[in-house]
Amino acid sequence: MSNINFLPTIEDAYGALSAEQLDILRQQVLSEGGDIASIQSRFNYAWGLVKSHDAEDQRLGVKLLTDIYKESPMRRRESLYYLAIGCYKLGEYAMAKRYADALVAHEPDNAQARTLKAMVEQKIQTEGLKGAALVGAGLAAVAAAAGFLLRQRRP
């Protein structure tokens, strides 16, 4: 059994912290020296940022998680999971899939990681279908306009 089966779901990432709660996390990081703050303080702040409704906050959260991933081998699996969620929220589904794939590759029996990967893949498929529908609608509109113009040119 994996040691990260207690992590939040994607749905949990949409429960934003209050501005006051997020500021407390930010102040903790600053009081510890900012970039040299403890991994735990930066991690808590990063997760609070990812949960935000503001895309810029989310991007900063993903950046902090990326830094933590690089700096702390002990937090890599956890960082991958949270990075996948952060990228998912930002609509960066290809990156979310990369992180989820990496996590599942290391922990194939982790049910939460597999569920996260499946959700990301479902979103990619849904977005792909929406894109195909938009392209199809665009092509139909162009064909209709071309047909109309060709009829107008006939004497």
Curated annotation (Swiss-Prot):
Membrane topology category: Single-pass membrane protein
For side Cytoplasmic, which residue ranges? Answer: 1-130
Localized where? Mitochondrion outer membrane
Disulphide bridges: none
Write out the transmembrane intervals: 131-150
* Molecular function GO terms recorded: lipid binding; molecular adaptor activity
Which GO annotations describe the biological process of this protein? mitochondrial fission; peroxisome fission; positive regulation of mitochondrial fission
**According to its UniProt record, where is this protein mainly located?**
mitochondrion
User: GO cellular-component terms in the record?
Assistant: mitochondrial outer membrane; peroxisomal membrane
Record keywords, A-Z: Membrane, Mitochondrion, Mitochondrion outer membrane, Repeat, TPR repeat, Transmembrane, Transmembrane helix
Domain of life according to the entry: Eukaryota
**Does Phosphoprotein appear among the keywords?**
no
Q: Does the keyword Mitochondrion apply?
A: yes
Taken from the record's topology, the Mitochondrial intermembrane segments are: 151-155
Q: Where are the TPR repeats?
A: 77-110
The record's similarity note reads: Belongs to the FIS1 family.
Q: What role is this protein assigned?
A: Has a role in mitochondrial fission. Has a role in outer membrane fission but not matrix separation.
Instruction: Tell what the record comments on domains.
Output: The C-terminus is required for mitochondrial localization, while the N-terminus is necessary for mitochondrial fission.
Could you tell me what this protein is called? Mitochondrial fission 1 protein
